[in-house]
Structure formats: structure tokens, C-alpha cells
């Protein structure tokens, strides 16, 4: 938009806007933040603001919109959630004291990855900013949640691993030093990831050396430096809460591609994108926001270290065995606020009095938690409690300084306790004395004038005034009262005596308010020195919260403590799918065993659609993940290997981010397993080959099975509708056939949902089609067509291993096909609800049907 003729203020605006062309500029004017030009037009649409104009009388009025400064966070968050950046331009001096144009400057650039303000729905969500640097030998990747100050860093060899990490983390913004192709940029944007250029800062900054202190890898150092520089450049303040970067190897954890996590629905439903329907939804019995976020982190990075897994199990077992200790901890955790994010707000300088008091209350609750743990009588719980520092002195200093129920704002007074400051107490005494004097004056003036409804009031424009109703104006003493304001029903006056005391009262109020803010700022700075200790405490309480949640899950859902095998064997007794079990009526889920000894690497699973093959496969993966995060698992007993990787090909959804077809995605995911799986991996393949022609698909599926068997040796569950593949057990020694049972009763298909040995020996595809509601005419035509095709292309196969056709004609062949009219009549009969008919109506219907058949 071309620039209009400007005033000095607008000239200042344009100079600042030129520095942030890709951001919305929120420009502070008095009590509002204003947007101009294109920002105003676009912002008014997104934020549903009224679009008006500045300089309406000029030939070229400037589009303008505004938001109140008290509500700015919500508007900024709305823009940031949609992927935009927002530059906050503040008045840097008191407009009343400014000489000429008020100085303004950018105090913060809010971006999708640097959002500090979190709504109630975001409490369990981490908001990651990720930094990626490319060097010879690979990529350094560092990510941080600014609201908590945590920083993690790793390095990978291949760009595909970078993209997988970005998608798995669900990072909101990536700072990328390098050339990003248009297709890659588009893919990230489709995943709601904002791509930003690195920032630059002159000189050295203490935060950089502090967070890098444990790093030795140059690539990781570069990634962390780029991350911290971007944070400092955008936030424009000291970031004392940034934590020492924690370096990790991807191989330290069970590796799962983003697609695997999505297929298994670890943290969100694949259907809705929401928490409900995910494994996180089932397991999340956490009490604190910190615990919820940590549980999510654990789900995305299950452990490989058996020692660490067992340490977690020990804590869960101890809490499971002691109901009263567990319940006391839960009660105390309810009094713990989000220490991690409160610490971030302290460092940021925007913590308010209520939040500081929340911090103190959290520390008081921590003392109760420590007492409960130490007195539990369990060595593991006692040791955990002894390792927690309750920060008692800090809690005491906060509660001794702040009133019990402070206001949110620190600038309006009423936040500091009496006795904290002698000067403050004197100002308050003067204020109270002045207010008593005002009350006394009001009473005396009523007596002097005879005006019973005379009252003394105050506003910021006129200060203190005497208000008299219109009906009593004649009684006003004109020699002492000076009219100041006329209202519809009243007149307002001042007197020399009133103005004299007003100055004394307002001066005391002003000094009191200023001193309270000064004392609060001193308290905030004192708390800032404790940030590292508060962050450590937050981590300890978050982990305890997750342990308690796991113990509650185990008790309420009858989960068992899994054991681990070094012999690469699986023995799950009566295993259940945790999410499916949670949504079904209590006791209705049908459990299944899964036993694979050392000599068995592949189970080939056959059975009709909808019978539960996919559920059975996912069930094993979820049990393995739960076991490796330290949780108990849904089974009567479970012995598992420690898996190093999980690969899946489950579901028929296209890759929304890459634009690949279903078959290409299928082959890509299969290739991931073939290239990278080891004998310690878990592979789940569901209906590989269905995305292409039948014989192509069957050949590919068979070759993939043979490769997994001969070259990889991973524990594999392979579901297929190609029944010919079941003959592979004759040549592949480590492959066994299993199937999902089903039976037919009175012409109806009954899914048994039980896993049985051997291949399925009968097709129920036509029954499934019936369950789906396909018209009889379609089913009949499909059966006839399939019968002809089989007759034309029949080939000899083992009679005991007949082709398991999806639409088998055996069950539906009709010697005398029905006429169309008869078919319609049968459909009408099948749809009648006899329970809603009277006997007479039923008799009439039967008579009508008989007549119709006679006519045909």
C-alpha cells in the first residue's frame, strides 16, 4: 500500500514498520495498540476488529484498527496461532513528561515459536522453537520451549531425519540456516511450521555461554547458539530462565518416525487431531500441567536403558502398593501450580502478584509432598523425597511480603503487607486519614447546607468533587462552592479546602502506589535468583506426578508390571488395546495372547475385515511403548524385549504433507523398515500391496516378508488378504500363521476377536459387505462376476490353502436369482420394525406382500 501524507507520529510508525516488514506492528498510542495500513486491513479481518481510518478529513485517510492494551495478549496469541509474527511497539517514556514526540521502540517480537502467554487449553502443550544448522557430516538440531526455558540438542546425518524430528516435535517455528527448497518449505508450512531466517546479534551474551556449558560437539554448539541468538533478538531482554542445553543421541531412545506416532495415535487421535482417543488420553491421570507435558515427552521418547526403565517401574510399584501415600500426594499436587512456566514469567519480568503467590503456595504444597514421601516407609519414595528442596525460605519471603489476596496488576497498589515498609505504612496512614477527613467533610457539608443527598466523589479528570442534585442547587453556598461540571441530574463543585486535602491524599496515594511497585520489583528480582532451583523442583514434581498417574492407571485398569527378556521373545498373556478397552463398556473387551519365541520372527495374520487384525497389531506396539516409558501394561502378564525401533504400515490415509499417493506412502514406509530395522525392532505391516494390481501386490508382499525373514529378523506382525502367502510357512522356518476367528450362526457373521493358530480357512467378505449395507443386487452381481473370473483364470493350489477371496461366492450363490420387484419386496420386509406395529398393521402388511407376490 502506498504511503499517505504523514504526521510526525506516522513518520515514526513507518520508520519502525520498515524494520519488521513481515510482522504485524502493534503500535502503542495511549491505552491502545493501533494497527495501520495493510496491518489494519488484514488484522481487522482476522481479529474481527472494526476497521476505521486515521485522518478521516484528509484526501487519503489511513486504515486503522486498535485493541485495548489490557487485552493485547489474547489478540497477539490469535495471530501467532495462525502463524503470523507480531512486533510490540511500546511507549518508552511517560507521554506527560515527553518533550515533543513520545519515544517508542520494539520491546518484543512474538513469533509462533516464542509465544510466552499460554491459555488453559495449552497447559499440557510444549511450544517449541527449533534451530537447524547444516555442516559437513550432518545437521545440528536444537529446540526450546521459551515458556519453560528447557533446551534440547542433538545431531543427525540426513535431512529426512531433520524433517521427521520437526514433525514429531510438532515444532511451531524453525530457524533454518541454509537453502530450503520450495517443496520442503511448502511441506513444513502445511504442517503449520513457520520457517524463519537466523537472527544476528553483536557481541557476546552470557546466556549463550551458559546454555552451551555442557556441549562438546561443534554442530550442536552452533545449533544452540543460533537458537539463543534468535530468542535474544526477538525477545529483547535478558533470558535468565534458559536452562543448560541437554544433549542427547536419537539412538538413546526407541525410534519412531512421525508417521508411526501418528498411526499409533500416541498423543492425538488420527481422526480428530484431539487428545481424546489417543494413548495419552488413556494414561493421563496427571494432576499438574508439568506432569502432562512430561508424559507427552516420555511417550515420544521411550527408553532403551533397562536400568532407567526399572527405576521408573520401582517408583510406580511403590506408589501402587501404598494407596494412602498416593492419595496424599495427589491432594498436595493439586496445590502445585506450573512452576516451570511461572519461573519463565519471573525471568521475563511479567509475573504478576497473584502468580508470585501461586509460586509460594506451590512451595508450601511441596513441603507436604516431601513429608508424605519421607514418612511412607518405602526406601524408594523416601529417597525421592529427600532429594527435593522445598525452597522454604523463598516461600516465606513471598508470603511475608504479599497480601493474602493481591490484585493481578502490580501497578495499582494493594499488594504489599502492612509492616513490610515504614514509609509505605506512613503513606497508607495519610491516605486513611485523608479518607476519614473526606467522610467527615461530607457529613459537615450536609449539615451546613441542608442537602441530605450531598456526596463527595472522585474521578481522574477532576479529582475530588462535591455532587449536588439539580433539585438542591439553590441551597449551594455560592461563596464557597465553585461549579466544575454539569451533569444531566446533578452539578459538581469544588472548594479550596477540598482541593488542598486532595493534593495531600493524591500525593500519598501516588507515593504509596509507586513504593509498592518498587517493593514488588525487588521481590521479583529476589525470586529470579532462585530460578534454576525452581526449574529443578518443577522437573522432580512433574516426574512424581507421572509416576502417580501410572500407579493409578495400573490399579484402576488392572495393568501388570512387564518384565524384559534378553532372548528376543514376547509373551503377552491376555493383552488388551488400552484405548479400545477404554471406550468399550467395562469388561467387554476380548483379550488375546501374543507369544513369539526366539525362533519365531514373523506372524502372518489372516482373517476377515473388521475382525480385529489391526487392533491386535497396534496392541502390541502400544504395550511395548508403555513398558519402555516405565508404565504398567494392559495384560495379565507381559514379557518383552527392549525394542530399538518401531515401524508401521497401518491405515490407508495418503501422506497429507508430501502429496504422495497411498501406494507410494505404503512402499516408502515399507522401505523404511527394510532399510533400517534390526533384529531388535518391531515391524507392523497391515495389508501391504493392496494399493496396486492383485498379482503385483501379492508378489511385493511375499518378497517383503521373505526379506524381513532372511535379512532383518525383526519381530513382525504382517496382516494380509493374500491367502496364498500363508503357504510361506512351508519354506520360511521363522514364520507362523495365525488368524482372527469368526463363525456363522443362523446366516449371521459373528466376529470372535480371538487370535487362533493357523491360517483362516473361510472367507466372510460377502458378510462384511452385507454389514456395510450394500444392496442385495450389488452383492449378487459381484458374486456372479467373481465366479466367472475364477472359472476363466482358475489355477491349482493346495486344497487346504484355498484363496481367501474378499467376495467369495460360496455363501451367496442363488440358484434362481430374484426379480427386481421381488428384491425390492425383500428389502421392504427387512426394513420393517415389527416392534413399532400393532397386530392389525402386521396382518395388513403380510396381506399386501402376499398380493404383490401373486401379481408377480
UniProtKB/Swiss-Prot annotation:
Gene3D superfamilies: 1.10.1420.10, DNA repair protein MutS, domain I, MutS, connector domain, P-loop containing nucleotide triphosphate hydrolases. The keyword DNA damage applies. Keywords: ATP-binding, DNA damage, DNA repair, DNA-binding, Nucleotide-binding. PROSITE patterns: DNA_MISMATCH_REPAIR_2. GO terms for molecular function: ATP binding; ATP-dependent DNA damage sensor activity; damaged DNA binding; mismatched DNA binding. ATP binds at residues 607-614. One of its GO terms (cellular component) is cytosol. The keyword Transferase does not apply. Signal peptide: none annotated. GO terms for biological process: mismatch repair. It holds the Pfam family MutS_V. PANTHER family: DNA MISMATCH REPAIR PROTEIN MSH1, MITOCHONDRIAL, DNA MISMATCH REPAIR PROTEIN MUTS FAMILY MEMBER. This protein is involved in the repair of mismatches in DNA. It is possible that it carries out the mismatch recognition step. This protein has a weak ATPase activity. Belongs to the DNA mismatch repair MutS family. This is DNA mismatch repair protein MutS. It comes from Lactobacillus delbrueckii subsp. bulgaricus (strain ATCC BAA-365 / Lb-18).
Amino acid at each position: 500500500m502506498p504511503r499517505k501524507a504523514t504526521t510526525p507520529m506516522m513518520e515514526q510508525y513507518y520508520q519502525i514498520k520498515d524494520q519488521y516488514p513481515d510482522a504485524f506492528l502493534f503500535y502503542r498510542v495511549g491505552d491502545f495498540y493501533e494497527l495501520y495500513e495493510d496491518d489494519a486491513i488484514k488484522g481487522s479481518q482476522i481479529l474481527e476488529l472494526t476497521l476505521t481510518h486515521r485522518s478521516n478529513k484528509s484526501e487519503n485517510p489511513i486504515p486503522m484498527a486498535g485493541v485495548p492494551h489490557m487485552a493485547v495478549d489474547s489478540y497477539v496469541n490469535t495471530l501467532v496461532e495462525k502463524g503470523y509474527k507480531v512486533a510490540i511497539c511500546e511507549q518508552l517514556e511517560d507521554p506527560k513528561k515527553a518533550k515533543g514526540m513520545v519515544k517508542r521502540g520494539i520491546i518484543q517480537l512474538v513469533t509462533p515459536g516464542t509465544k510466552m502467554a499460554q491459555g488453559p487449553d495449552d497447559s499440557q502443550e510444549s511450544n517449541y522453537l527449533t534451530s537447524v544448522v547444516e555442516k559437513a557430516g550432518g545437521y545440528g538440531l536444537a529446540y526450546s520451549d521459551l515458556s519453560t526455558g528447557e533446551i534440547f540438542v542433538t545431531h543427525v546425518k540426513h535431512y529426512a531425519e531433520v524433517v521427521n524430528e520437526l514433525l514429531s516435535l510438532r515444532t511451531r517455528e524453525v530457524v533454518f540456516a541454509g537453502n530450503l527448497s520450495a517443496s520442503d518449505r511448502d511441506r513444513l508450512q502445511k504442517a503449520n511450521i513457520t520457517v524463519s531466517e537466523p537472527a544476528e546479534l553483536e557481541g557476546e551474551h552470557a546466556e549463550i555461554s551458559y546454555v552451551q556449558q555442557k556441549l562438546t560437539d561443534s554442530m550442536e554448539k552452533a545449533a544452540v547458539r543460533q537458537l539463543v541468538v534468535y530468542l535474544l533478538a526477538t525477545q529483547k531482554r535478558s533470558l535468565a530462565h534458559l536452562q543448560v542445553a541437554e544433549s542427547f543421541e536419537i539412538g538413546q531412545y526407541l525410534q519412531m518416525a512421525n508417521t508411526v506416532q501418528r498411526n499409533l495415535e500416541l498423543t492425538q487421535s488420527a481422526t480428530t487431531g484431539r487428545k481424546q482417543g489417543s494413548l495419552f488420553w488413556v494414561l493421563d491421570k496427571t494432576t499438574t500441567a508439568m506432569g502432562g507435558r512430561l508424559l507427552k515427552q516420555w511417550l515420544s521418547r521411550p527408553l532403551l536403558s533397562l536400568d532407567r526403565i526399572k527405576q521408573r517401574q520401582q517408583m510406580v510399584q511403590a506408589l501402587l502398593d501404598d494407596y494412602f501415600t498416593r492419595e496424599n500426594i495427589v491432594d498436595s499436587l493439586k496445590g502445585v501450580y506450573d512452576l516451570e512456566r511461572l519461573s519463565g514469567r519471573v525471568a521475563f519480568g511479567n509475573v504478576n502478584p497473584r502468580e508470585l503467590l501461586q509460586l509460594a503456595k506451590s512451595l508450601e504444597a511441596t513441603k507436604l509432598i516431601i513429608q508424605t514421601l519421607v514418612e511412607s516407609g518405602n526406601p524408594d519414595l523416601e529417597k525421592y523425597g529427600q532429594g527435593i528442596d522445598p525452597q522454604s525460605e523463598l516461600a516465606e519471603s513471598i508470603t511475608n511480603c504479599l497480601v493474602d489476596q493481591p490484585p493481578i496488576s502490580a501497578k495499582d497498589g494493594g499488594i504489599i503487607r502492612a509492616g513490610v515498609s515504614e514509609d509505605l505504612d506512613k503513606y497508607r496512614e495519610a491516605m486513611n486519614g485523608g479518607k476519614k477527613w473526606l467522610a467527615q467533610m461530607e457529613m459537615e457539608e450536609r449539615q451546613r447546607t441542608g442537602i441530605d443527598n450531598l456526596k463527595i466523589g472522585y474521578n481522574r479528570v477532576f479529582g475530588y468533587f462535591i455532587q449536588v442534585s439539580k433539585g438542591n442547587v439553590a441551597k449551594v453556598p455560592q461563596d464557597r462552592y465553585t461549579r466544575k461540571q454539569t451533569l444531566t441530574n446533578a452539578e459538581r463543585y469544588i472548594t479550596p479546602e477540598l482541593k488542598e486535602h486532595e493534593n495531600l491524599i493524591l500525593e500519598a496515594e501516588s507515593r504509596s502506589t509507586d513504593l509498592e511497585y518498587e517493593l514488588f520489583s525487588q521481590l521479583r528480582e529476589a525470586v529470579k535468583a532462585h530460578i534454576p532451583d525452581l526449574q529443578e523442583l518443577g522437573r522432580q514434581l512433574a516426574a512424581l506426578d507421572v509416576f502417580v498417574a501410572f500407579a493409578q492407571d495400573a490399579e484402576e485398569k488392572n495393568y501388570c508390571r512387564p518384565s524384559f527378556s534378553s532372548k528376543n521373545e514376547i509373551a503377552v498373556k491376555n493383552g488388551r488395546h488400552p484405548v479400545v478397552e477404554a471406550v468399550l463398556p467395562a469388561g467387554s473387551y476380548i483379550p488375546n495372547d501374543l507369544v513369539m519365541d526366539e525362533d519365531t520372527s514373523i506372524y502372518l495374520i489372516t482373517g476377515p475385515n473388521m475382525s480385529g487384525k489391526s487392533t491386535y497389531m497396534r496392541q502390541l506396539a502400544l504395550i511395548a511403548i508403555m513398558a519402555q516409558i516405565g508404565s504398567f501394561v494392559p495384560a495379565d502378564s507381559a514379557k518383552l524385549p527392549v525394542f530399538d525401533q518401531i515401524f508401521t504400515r497401518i491405515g490407508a490415509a495418503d501422506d497429507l504433507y508430501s502429496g504422495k499417493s497411498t501406494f507410494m506412502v505404503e512402499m516408502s514406509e515399507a522401505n523404511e523398515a527394510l532399510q533400517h530395522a534390526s533384529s531388535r525392532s518391531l515391524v507392523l505391516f497391515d495389508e501391504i500391496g493392496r494399493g496396486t494390481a492383485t498379482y503385483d501386490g501379492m508378489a511385493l508382499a511375499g518378497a517383503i516378508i521373505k526379506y524381513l525373514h532372511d535379512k532383518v529378523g525383526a519381530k513382525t506382525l504382517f496382516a494380509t488378504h493374500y491367502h496364498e502367502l500363508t503357504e510361506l510357512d512351508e519354506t520360511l522356518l521363522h514364520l507362523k500363521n495365525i488368524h482372527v476367528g469368526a463363525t456363522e450362526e443362523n446366516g449371521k457373521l459373528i466376529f470372535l476377536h480371538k487370535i487362533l493358530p493357523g491360517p483362516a480357512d473361510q472367507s466372510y467378505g460377502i458378510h462384511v459387505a452385507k454389514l456395510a449395507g450394500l444392496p442385495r443386487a450389488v452383492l449378487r452381481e459381484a458374486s456372479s462376476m467373481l465366479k466367472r473370473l475364477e472359472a476363466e483364470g482358475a489355477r491349482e493350489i493346495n486344497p487346504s490353502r484355498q484363496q481367501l477371496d474378499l467376495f467369495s461366492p460360496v455363501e451367496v450363490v442363488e440358484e434362481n436369482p430374484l426379480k427386481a420387484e421381488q428384491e425390492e419386496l425383500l428389502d421392504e420386509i427387512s426394513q420393517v420394525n415389527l416392534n413399532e406395529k400393532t397386530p392389525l398393521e402386521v396382518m395388513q402388511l403380510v396381506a399386501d406382500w402376499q398380493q404383490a407376490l401373486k401379481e408377480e
